[in-house]
Amino acid sequence: MSAVLLLPLVAVSSANATADAQGKAKFTVTTTATSVAARSDRRPVAGGVHDKKVNKTFISWAGQYEDSYVQSYDHRKSTWSAPNRIADGASDAHNYPTMVQARDGHLLIFRGMHNVELRMSRSPEPHSADGVWEETLISKNAATYPMPFVTRDGTIYVFYRETTRDLDGTTPTDTRPMLYVVSKDNGKTWKTSTDLTGDRFAIGSTARADNMNEIYIGQLRQEENGRVRIVYTLAGGGPEGNKHDRYHRNIYYTWFDPQNRHFYSASGKDLGTQIDDADQEKHLLVAETPLTLPNNVKSPDYIQQVGTTLGQPFLLWFMGDEAGGPLRNYLSTWNGRSWETKEVARGLRTREVEKVDLFTWRVYATEDGKPNVNTYLVRLGRFWSPETVIPTAKPVQRVEIVENFRDPARAIFSGASSNRDVAIADGDIYVAGFTRR
């Protein structure tokens, strides 16, 4: 597999120019809670679920002090519940909630208490977000960035990043691999990936010359066929020496099979139960990026998106601009033999993608400091075009598509807070979707 070195294109879409290009999609937006959202580092993974049994949608979001809140939408009554605070966030933007529904109907919220431990909160009753939730400590394994999903047979996986130095006190601070935990009994008991495979970690490295041994998964997406698509970048101190998150570098892609716990490349190469540095550089490298801070932006950004068209993956990601201009947005497409990468827009923070049909995906994106969510379409994993603008009263910082969504509760928009301090929580919570006829 070959990676593509980035080359600038002459003509790309301008974020400003696309705001006037209205497509056919007609979104409605509901403000479910006003002036409640704190800054959050949440990834576009597991924000909410639709429960067909009771015809309700459940969403999660981070409020003041990064405390976890849930709300429910009753599709029969067309009403939203008041926010229910269910867990403490310990005043850290990393401690945001992620939500899945266990096979027994209970809602589960996972939080990685920044570099300390992985916690789970369980709803007191199945198919309901009401009441006082029960909290469980899954492990004290220096966990951050939980990414949960539930397989067809009800097995629960939670991927997370480990800060190894906080466990042994000696490993360089920029060694931070990915691991996971697994439950086969609706979250009652857990085993780690090391317990199950014997591998020290699932994705990672320990001895790169550039000290880029931190893994930042931008998005993890489980498909209907069970495959889990993953896009990620590296971080670390660079050649100057060990330092957490001084630089970012490169884009990588893999997919994971929960049935045998093996990872695979886009070409189908079986990499076994662990991805190490040799694997990722030989088989998973999508785009090679310079070890710099363009316009003082860590690049590629922490957030990326992954989708597939007829089984072929595509990725969205962005970087700062060396000349000080707007952010540069890239689309990488697997053509069956290698990766092709092109610049498709400027000035956007791509937040989430949603499958529209066999050939088309919708992209949700924002512009820094501005309200509204802009949407775009990616067709055949290659062709980018503007779609519409979804109006919001205030800027939006995070977007997640609800699992198995039912309109009008399709996408969760967490509003941007006015301050990085999570004691300040003045962003709105919006839910967007199409009007049901």
Predicted features along the sequence, with ranges:
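Secretory targeting and sorting signals
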Residues: 1-19
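Extracellular, repeat-based ectodomains that mediate carbohydrate processing or recognition
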Residues: 20-437
